[in-house]
């Protein structure tokens, strides 16, 4: 597969890319083939990627095992259904968190769910345990595997965080998601990845979580039921198709996920919808952030945090964005994570070399 990072292209090469990318009204383009479903709802197509998110111990890997077992067997597992074409039946499973022993347990679980023998390696499933490697080497290994495995249709990456040195790095996150978009388009595969949620809220962790939310075809949440801790609930958080009915599973005595047939989805709250949490990345354009910072730092660097927050309020107010204290704190955190503002010693200052 072609790697285009940090290389300088000639005008002729750029012209070729432009020609390749031009959309014609007279051409015929195929709709992305559907390959993964929950009941009758589409959650995955070739040429796209999706994700499962959840807090620690929510059984995310058990849920992913069911997805893989469905793709491997072509049958329904839990509520997952798969329809991969014959030339897209190979599955690549990447585990970045567990050692070889626990990866083998996951592999055996998948085979049992798919009703396949555990005493021999499956023809259409390759599992790689990449825990011991650096993020850069993990990425290179995965790129090589995706580029060379024939008849590849599904790639599982558990988890995406381990491809980054800094989970809040905007440039690293953009690079990884760009790789996902390149791989899925070039090879016409579907990638499903796994990411932890923040401990204190429902958001996927770090800037990589924000990028996933913006670009993924489907985001599913796996959450421990608040009333029965033995049950995990799967529901759609972001989805391009219609939402599927949330479903639940538990781990049985044989350490296998099984559906909870008696589970009833929680009713949606009646009345005014709950307001979405304030997110500076989504709600305020980059040019507004820039103009607000120019105004906030018009008199130079700022020497303490409280003054910094007050100057932010003034700077954003000049751009018609009103910030109370809590929103100003969120904006300050966002600017720090984006490295638009950095702290040098005791002073806050604009970073001209930030990457949005």
What label would you give each PLM region?
Residues 155-158, 190-195, 341:
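Short beta-strand segments at enzyme active-site cores
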Residues 85-168:
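Conserved inter-motif catalytic segment of the P-loop NTP-binding fold
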Residues 51-53, 57, 62, 171-259:
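Phosphate-binding/switch region of NTP-binding enzymes
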Residues 66-67, 102-110, 141, 145, ...:
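Alpha-helical scaffold elements adjacent to nucleotide-binding pockets in ATP/GTP-utilizing enzyme cores
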Residues 44, 83-86, 118-120, 147-149, ...:
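Conserved catalytic network of the ASCE P-loop NTPase/AAA+ motor domain
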């Amino acid at each position: 597969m072609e790697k285009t990072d940090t290389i300088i292209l000639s005008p002729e090469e750029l012209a070729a890319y432009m020609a390749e990318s031009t959309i014609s009204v007279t051409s015929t383009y195929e709709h992305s083939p559907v390959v993964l479903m929950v009941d009758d709802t589409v959650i995955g197509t070739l040429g796209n990627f999706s994700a499962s998110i959840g807090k620690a111990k929510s059984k995310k890997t058990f849920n992913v095992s069911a997805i893989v077992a469905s793709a491997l067997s072509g049958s329904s597992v839990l509520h997952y259904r798969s329809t991969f074409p014959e030339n897209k039946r190979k599955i690549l499973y990447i585990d970045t968190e567990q050692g070889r022993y626990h990866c083998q347990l996951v592999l055996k679980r998948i085979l049992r769910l798919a009703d396949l023998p555990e005493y021999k390696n499956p023809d259409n499933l390759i599992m790689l345990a990449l825990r011991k490697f650096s993020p850069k080497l993990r990425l290179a290994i995965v790129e090589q595997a995706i580029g060379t495995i024939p008849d590849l249709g599904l790639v599982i990456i558990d988890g995406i965080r381990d491809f980054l040195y800094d989970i809040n790095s905007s440039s690293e996150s953009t690079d990884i998601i760009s790789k996902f978009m390149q791989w899925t388009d070039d090879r016409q595969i579907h990638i499903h990845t796994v990411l932890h949620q923040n401990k204190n809220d429902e958001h996927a962790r770090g800037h990589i979580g924000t990028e996933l939310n913006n670009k993924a075809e489907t985001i599913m949440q796996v959450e421990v039921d608040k009333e029965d801790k033995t049950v995990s609930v799967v529901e759609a958080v972001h989805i391009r198709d219609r939402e599927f009915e949330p479903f639940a599973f538990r781990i049985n005595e044989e350490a296998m996920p099984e559906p909870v047939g008696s589970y009833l989805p929680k009713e949606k709250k009646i009345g005014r919808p709950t307001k979405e949490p304030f997110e500076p990345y989504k709600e305020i354009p980059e040019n507004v952030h820039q103009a607000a910072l120019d105004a906030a730092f018009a008199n130079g660097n700022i020497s303490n945090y409280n003054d910094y927050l007050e100057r932010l309020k003034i700077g954003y107010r000049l751009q018609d964005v009103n910030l109370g204290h809590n929103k100003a704190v969120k904006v300050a955190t966002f600017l720090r994570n984006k490295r638009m503002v950095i702290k040098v010693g005791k002073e806050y200052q604009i970073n001209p070399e930030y990457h949005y």
